């Protein structure tokens, strides 16, 4: 029986754990004990911080694992790459994973490779001199965010200089390394792109249309596949994504790229994660819309058993999230069992909250059908 190490044990990793068990693999999981919902589902669980890469490596060497992976976790990706590199397993280089994890290093790589992205600065304080430098070199409005976090945490749109200092201070407080990204705001529609890579070859899977709260925090409210973009735009975005992945050195596993497309059709890469998209995009929506089991693909890459994806379906899929901003969805949640196409739903809170990050949401509803489900 092959042994698969899984980094992380939150609800985000549950589809990975369940798929590994379905495939008959022996699972060894590492995560903080708090919130480790997968610890009772795996064969072995170690309450080790997912960023303690050397301690995790030690256990993986003792267990002689055959592969290591994670899904939908930016924080876990560098540890996965480090262990794989040290043990001669399939994965991205540790350097590539670190570059993809830090938004500033990522943007520098994009610039060097000619990948279109917004103008940006990385700052480590909100002193007057820093504010002055930003004002002199960039145009409002701006987006301020931590350089090393995800899930819309600490992200804010800044419309005027008076609130810039507070926005940077908040982003620095959210950042693990106390770095904040300041970038010129790009208007237009927001999409994301899912790829899987193996030994340096990249395979496009799907493009997702997004609906967000908009300013100031841009938290996702809906995801829908496939995108309504033209075939020509699909081809352009796939080509840009391949160049961006190569610039980061991402050669193996899933990737999730986020884009903005202006009204004039200009395309900008906002960021790329060396992991599949969260919010059920990678774990559910890709499979429902294309027929390709993305989670299994990630495991196959880690074990060196990857087979080129075959897209067998052309369905629509999507997810609606419940929060104060989308309380109009409450009757649909109450009647979800009778709505054609709904495949899974859950309401986690009775009292809905206004959201500033994805963790504030109170439920989800996933659908599949021949056409987009409009609620």
Label every PLM stretch briefly.
Residues 1-96, 126, 306-307, 315, ...:
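ATP-binding N-terminal substructure of ATP-dependent carboxylate-amine bond-forming enzymes
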Residues 66, 178, 246:
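Short acidic/polar active-site loop segments enriched in Thr and Asp
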Residues 102-181, 187, 199-200, 227-231, ...:
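Active-site nucleotide/adenylate-binding loops and adjacent lid/helix of ATP-dependent enzymes
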Residues 129, 297-375:
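Peripheral (often C-terminal) accessory segments that flank ATP-dependent C-N-forming ligase machineries
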Residues 162, 184-250, 254, 261, ...:
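ATP-dependent carboxylate/phosphate-activation module, predominantly the ATP-grasp catalytic core
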Residues 252-258, 308-313:
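Flexible, glycine/charged-enriched surface loops at secondary-structure junctions
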């Amino acid at each position: 029986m092959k042994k698969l190490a899984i980094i992380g044990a939150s609800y985000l990793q549950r589809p990975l754990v369940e798929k590994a068990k379905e495939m008959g693999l022996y699972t060894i999981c590492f995560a903080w004990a708090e919130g480790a919902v997968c610890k009772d589902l795996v064969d072995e669980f170690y309450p080790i911080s997912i960023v303690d890469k050397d301690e995790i490596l030690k256990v993986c060497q003792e267990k002689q694992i055959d592969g290591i992976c994670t899904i939908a976790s930016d924080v876990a990706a560098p540890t996965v790459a480090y262990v794989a590199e040290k043990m001669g397993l399939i994965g991205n280089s540790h350097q590539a994973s670190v570059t993809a994890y830090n938004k500033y290093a990522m943007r520098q790589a994009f610039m060097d490779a000619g990948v279109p992205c917004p103008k940006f600065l990385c700052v480590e304080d909100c002193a007057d001199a820093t504010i002055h430098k930003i004002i002199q070199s960039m145009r409002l409005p701006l987006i301020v965010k931590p350089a090393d976090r995800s899930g819309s945490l600490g992200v804010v749109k800044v419309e005027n200089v008076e609130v810039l200092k507070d926005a940077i201070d908040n982003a620095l407080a959210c950042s693990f390394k106390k770095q904040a990204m300041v970038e010129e705001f790009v208007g237009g529609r927001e999409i994301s792109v899912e790829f899987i890579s193996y030994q340096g070859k990249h395979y496009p899977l799907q493009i997702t249309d997004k609906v967000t709260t908009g300013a100031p925090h841009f938290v996702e409210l809906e995801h829908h596949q496939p995108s309504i973009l033209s075939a020509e735009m699909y081809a352009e975005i796939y080509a840009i994504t391949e160049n961006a992945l190569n610039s980061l050195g991402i050669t193996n596993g899933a990737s999730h790229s986020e884009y903005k497309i202006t009204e004039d059709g200009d395309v900008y890469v906002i960021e790329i994660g060396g992991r599949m998209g969260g919010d059920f995009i990678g774990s559910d929506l890709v499979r429902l819309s294309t027929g390709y089991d993305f989670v299994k693909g990630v495991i196959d890459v880690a074990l060196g058993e990857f087979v080129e994806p075959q897209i067998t379906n052309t369905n629509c899929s999507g997810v609606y999230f419940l929060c104060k901003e989308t309380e109009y969805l409450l009757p649909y949640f109450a009647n979800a069992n009778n709505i054609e196409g709904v495949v899974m739903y859950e309401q986690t809170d009775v009292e809905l909250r206004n959201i500033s990050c994805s963790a504030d949401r109170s439920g989800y509803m996933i659908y599949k059908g021949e056409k987009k489900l409009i609620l």
